[in-house]
From Swiss-Prot:
Belongs to the IlvD/Edd family. GO terms for cellular component: cytosol. The keyword Iron applies. Pfam families: ILV_EDD_C, ILVD_EDD_N. InterPro entries: Dihydro-acid_dehy_C, DihydroxyA_deHydtase, DiOHA_6PGluconate_deHydtase_CS, ILV_EDD_C, ILV_EDD_N, IlvD/EDD_N. The modification N6-carboxylysine is found at K124. This is Dihydroxy-acid dehydratase. Homodimer. One of its GO terms (molecular function) is magnesium ion binding.
Length: 612
């Protein structure tokens, strides 16, 4: 029978000092021997997805205490990728994922906590906490802050619901007046919560449901809706319940590595492919799998992408649907249910709330014919339509669900947008270890695209060339030296893609990079090219004017230059680490240099390699 980890500091004469300190935090003699549940919060006033989380730790703590545990809250950092976008602040975004993972590990292990509740939400926070949870392998429940509501369109400019990406792309549209742009800016992000499309934050929070580590509705229940409160309370109760099962009954099925098995990772990636999630999820899922010691790699993702169809197109892949519409259509259980009916789901995996995925979907998939009344009511939660930074501030409901499997937000396998899914992996002579593209954001006529290489060596240079209108129809912008090591930090390229879209080149050009893309990216954008240029990857050999071929259907990304010429170029570069040909105006701190010295390319999840 496993002993409470916290017993290390709460039992024995030699721990009198530690107990004295515990007492100073509010614990009493009656608390020693109860499971200590660490609550990893990520409240910050910098990030709309986290601005409402200040009191959420106390809410979870109340449920922990009521269930017989002892709650101890701490905080992690949280970077807003949108605010950090387009300048050197983005160098810190991906590295912050590892800082978050380490900080959770440090706090939990230093204080010998028995279980963990992760209160996450935005882009790097959920992945960082996920990596930590799988590294620690103690009972854990995830609960995120929830998605933002989408914004009202602007008459005469955009008739559809708007979000952050609309504000970015329309900023370079010369037909949009300053007054109209100001109105779009006002409307784009109306409430607290993670940005309203199927961007990275919402994608990752949805994937925690499929992994089995969060509760039904975690990925889609709006931050503003009162229904979200029950998720926080239930997370606290479940954490104590799991802790008691493990420490009192020796039930290892509640541990995160018992839940997030290879089959669970396959489910999560199948969901991601079906819903056309952010390409960043590939990076984070690969990193999480390594922490879980699960053999799951790009080849597995490639195989899944050939089997799993695209069942949903949510912003930025569509102007019709946002996360609130996914919720109305039944949320993640509905997408998983469609995969289940298509024979594309592992039903026997465990979750933190149900014995199996199959049992969970029986109750929560509103399209199954077996769903409970509580589940049906839960998925009627609607936006409030009022600007606010307050959680649980409204209780609006839709009149009915969207269960249109042919033309609604979530389609059936029979009515899929495409036979193959919304994400896929490309290989070729400039991506020997792979590259990732979000096909859900591309018109099928662009699945085969050949163009001229327009080579730049930084995101800043790409933005300058695009806004200077030097990039023309038929060009493929190649941004090298922006990978995990070369950036360092593997910047997101939302501004270049948004500007191409705003200038009317979104369907006439392509962009490829060893960097990555925001979850808000759509269009012919290929990222995560591995190996990266700074690691000697052939993307660093591409020259201006080279012909590049993109063949999505055959999973090919190549430069049409013969092997002998590529070998000559490689020899010319020499054996020293490759760097941009001209200096970049970029201050790289010691912290970033330390990150660059340890980080791997994207095909490995951009994890750090540390010698044992």
């Amino acid at each position: 029978m496993p002993q409470l980890r916290s017993a290390t500091s709460t039992t024995g004469r030699n721990m009198a000092g530690a107990r004295a300190l515990w007492r100073a935090t509010g614990m009493g003699s009656e608390d020693f021997g109860k499971p200590i549940v660490a609550i990893a919060n990520s409240f910050t006033q910098f990030v709309p997805g986290h601005v409402h989380l200040k009191n959420m730790g106390e809410l979870v703590a109340s449920a922990v205490q009521e269930a017989g545990g002892v709650a101890k809250e701490f905080n992690t950092i949280a970077v807003d990728d949108g605010i950090a976008m387009g300048h050197d602040g983005m160098l810190y975004s991906l590295p912050s994922r590892d800082i978050i993972a380490d900080s959770v590990e440090y706090m939990v292990n230093a204080h010998c906590a028995d279980a963990l509740v992760c209160i996450s939400n935005c882009d790097k926070i959920t992945p960082g906490m996920l990596m930590a949870a799988l590294r620690l392998n103690i009972p854990v429940v995830f609960v995120s802050g929830g998605p933002m509501e989408s914004g009202e369109g602007v008459e005469g400019v955009v008739e559809h619901r708007v979000d952050l990406v609309d504000a970015m792309s329309l900023a370079v549209d010369e037909s949009v007046t300053d007054a109209q742009l100001a109105q779009i800016e006002e409307n784009a992000c109306p409430t607290c919560g993670s940005c309203s499309g199927m961007f990275t934050a919402n994608s990752m929070n949805c994937l925690t449901e499929a992994l089995g580590l969060s509760l039904p509705g975690n990925g889609t229940t709006l931050a503003t809706h009162v229904n979200r409160k029950r998720l926080f309370l239930e997370a606290g109760r479940r954490a104590v319940e799991s802790a008691k099962k493990y420490y009192e009954q020796d039930d290892e099925s509640v541990l995160p590595r018992s839940i997030a098995t290879k089959a669970a990772f396959e489910n999560a990636m199948a969901l991601d492919i079906a819903m056309g999630g952010s390409t960043n999820t590939v990076l984070h899922i690969l990193a999480a799998a390594q922490e879980a010691e699960v053999d799951f790699n790009l080849s597995d993702i490639d195989a899944l992408s050939r089997q799993v169809p695209c069942l949903a197109k949510v912003a930025p892949n569509s102007t019709t649907f946002h996360i609130e519409h996914v919720h109305r259509a039944g949320g993640i259980p509905a997408i998983l249910g469609e995969l289940r009916r298509g024979g594309l789901l592992n039903e026997d995996v465990h979750t933190v709330h149900s014995q199996t995925m199959g049992e969970w979907l029986d109750e929560w998939d509103i399209r199954s014919g077996k769903a409970s009344d509580a589940a049906k009511e839960f998925f009627l939660a609607a936006p409030g339509g009022v600007r606010t930074t307050q959680a649980f501030s409204q209780a609006n409901e839709y009149e009915d669900h969207d269960v249109d499997a042919a033309g609604g937000c979530i389609r059936s396998v029979e009515h899929a947008y495409t036979k193959e899914g919304g994400l896929c992996v490309l290989f070729g002579n400039i991506a020997e270890d792979g590259a990732v593209i979000k096909t859900a954001g591309i018109d099928p006529e662009l699945f085969h695209f050949t163009g001229r290489a327009f080579v730049v060596e930084s995101q800043d240079e790409a933005v300058h060339e695009i806004l200077s209108k030097n990039v023309k129809e038929g060009d493929i912008v190649v941004i090298a030296y922006e990978g995990p090591k070369g950036g360092p930090g593997m910047q997101e390229m939302l501004y270049p893609t948004s500007y191409l879209k705003g200038l009317g080149l979104g369907k006439k050009c392509a962009l490829i990079t060893d960097g990555r893309f925001s979850g808000g990216t759509s269009g012919l954008s290929i990222g995560h090219i591995s190996p990266e240029a700074a690691a000697g990857g052939a993307v660093g050999l591409v020259q201006h004017g080279d012909e590049i071929e993109i063949d999505v259907e055959n999973r090919v990304l190549r430069v049409n230059v013969d092997d002998a010429e590529l070998a000559r170029r490689r020899q010319e570069k020499g054996d020293a680490p490759w760097k941009p040909t001209k200096p970049r105006e970029r201050r790289v701190s010691k912290a970033l240099k330390a990150y660059a010295s340890m980080v791997t390319s994207a095909d490995k999840g951009a994890v750090r390699v540390v010698e044992d």
